[in-house]
Amino acid sequence: MAKMRVYEYAKALNVSSKEILTALKNMDLEVNNHMAMLEEKAIKKLDAKYKKGGARAKSQKPAETNKNKQPQGVNQQSAGNQPNKIRDGKKNDVQNNQFNKNKKNNNNKKNKRNNNNNKNQHQQKPVKPKKELPEKITFSGTLTVGALAEELGKEPSELIKKLMLLGVMATINQELDKDTIELIASEYGVETEEVIVLEETELEKYEEPDNEEDLEIRPPVVTIMGHVDHGKTTLLDSIRKTKVVEGEAGGITQHIGAYQIEENGKKITFLDTPGHAAFTTMRARGAEVTDITILVVAADDGVMPQTVEAINHAKAAEVPIIVAVNKIDKESANPDRVMQELTEYGLVPEAWGGETIFVPLSALTGKGIDELVEMILLVSEVEELKANPNRQAKGTVIEAELDKGRGSVATLLVQTGTLHVGDPIVVGNTFGRVRAMVNDIGRRVKTAGPSTPVEITGLNDVPQAGDQFLVFKDEKTARSVGEARASKQLEEQRSDKAKLSLDDLFEQIKQGDVKDINLIVKADVQGSAEALTAALQKIEVEGVKVKIIHTGVGAITESDIILASASNAIVIGFNVRPDGNAKSTAEAENVDIRLHRIIYKVIDEIEAAMKGMLDPEYEEKVIGQVEVRQTFKVSKIGTIAGGYVTEGTITRDSGLRLIRDGVVIFEGEVDVLKRFKDDVKEVSQGYECGITIKKYNDIREGDILEAFVMQEIERT
């Protein structure tokens, strides 16, 4: 007789597994669960039980019951009533109908009972059909472990085990980021695709499409880039016929300015990006909104690191480059060298058969300026720059700051549409109504068309430089979208800590014990705060990392000092000062405030502080050697070595290494150093001395005692 599992035997008898388990227990046969295997002995006992008496009805299968019962009834009916059926057909028909009806009802009841039994069996049966792996899964944002398991057709427990093997402790409801989803999917050979869903907070959802016939010619937006001190701001001043360069601290443009000029009835908008390497993020932002890049290179300096950086930004933005070779009025100027150097970066002059326009000029004397403006207009005509002025305005934040008198002030570049005073507007995660607009020369305006820079007030908060803005039809929608975007940003900031990321895990493993230098950065404008933060985070000193606790715009306040005190941070003020309350709180809380106006000094000072925080690096220096010639054992003191200084000097505060037959036996410190009976600080070469080693007595004749000191190495 073949072996069977409990549930298989129960299914054969059309009874529940629970009933079979109870019966086995009554027979003193121990079976764990419905999946247990029944031995031949157990099957015989069960057969004996279920083939007798009251259990007989349950022991027969429905098909067998119907098969046996139906022929028996039919045969009896046909054998006993055959003559009556012939004599009284009508009566027999009624009886047969009644019999069939009863039989049908009985069968229905049995079928219903059988269905219920089958249902119970299905509920007890844990084995699910194996789902095939999909070729590809799609997701949006994040997925929980449970949701990913469902997508892959796997049990959540299996995914949790995989994550544990990767060193990640996760629950079924833990959210996984994109990288983790892709990693787990790749383990099963499944492709992934992230679907970008436009939410209610996405500005693109509210943007109106433009028709080709509505587009009109717009002014070009020109970005001036180049190395520090190559004359970018001077060039812009020369074009605008003004002098603002003298007001810049350290001769460096501290934040982006946007200006507009008019030449022969045609307008040109200029963005002045700072040239210092610390403002890389601001320069990149300038390249994103620009149509033409003017690369300023000094004829006497040639190509410098920031020049190459500017070329890369312009190429990444896929915008045409016009090279302005500045300072040609200097005696050391060599424009041909500049042209030669730039060919290495793919900028070949038209005169040499290339496509790049080179304009030699002097920003100081004004020579070549007219030709440069003419070239800008020529390139803009070729580019066919167009926008629809008859729609709701859309554009980018160039700069933003908090003004004491006017509140939140943002410099916007309108890229399409026309901005009006009174327009409901969403700017990044802020919203409001345009209360006032001022153009680049300080005059109030009521409208601003495409490629026009304006300064606006009326926002509920300070936006981030580089944020997108969009005008809405009504203030209610603008408020609701702005509040939703702000809430979403807050949730994302909170969830950044809770969300699972393999990157964080690997970083922690790589970093080990890392010291932090906590900083709070306050600046005059948002762009400077961002650029300074980016520069500080790029400082690399082994063993120490920069942690920016908070960045903000405006004066250093009491709340900044309280935050610094709680997080043990240093406050960096860039072009801002602490107010009275902040000063007194800083003194009381002993918080360090550092105020600067030049980026160089901030970086240098913080770098020096970081180097000071590191555990010092030491180098061992051997200063002397003693040969042990005799030993003396003294109670309460231990072993005293009588020795002769063969090399250098031995001092009382030096380290001591006991060497026997060329092998280091012990390393410790000098306990007592004597010359005759007197304690001495040091003993020089050629003299005898008595010496004991702290917490060590096994000194023998012929041993060598090597004295050494640890010298601190200055970090570079």
Swiss-Prot record:
Sequence intervals crossing the membrane: none
GO biological process terms held by the UniProt record: translational initiation
A Pfam family annotated for this UniProt entry: IF2_N
Keyword Nucleotide-binding: yes
UniProt-annotated location(s): Cytoplasm
Stretches the record annotates as Disordered: 50-136
Primary location class: cytoplasm
GO molecular function, one term: GTPase activity
Keywords per UniProt: Cytoplasm, GTP-binding, Initiation factor, Nucleotide-binding, Protein biosynthesis
Region described as G4: 326-329
Xref: Gene3D superfamilies: 1.10.10.2480, P-loop containing nucleotide triphosphate hydrolases, Translation factors, Translation initiation factor IF- 2, domain 3
G3: region residues: 272-275
Domain tr-type G: 217-386
Stretches for region G2: 251-255
Spans annotated as G1: 226-233
Its biological purpose: One of the essential components for the initiation of protein synthesis. Protects formylmethionyl-tRNA from spontaneous hydrolysis and promotes its binding to the 30S ribosomal subunits. Also involved in the hydrolysis of GTP during the formation of the 70S ribosomal complex.
NCBIfam families: IF-2, small_GTP
Full protein name: Translation initiation factor IF-2
Source organism: Bacillus subtilis (strain 168)
Gene behind the chain: infB
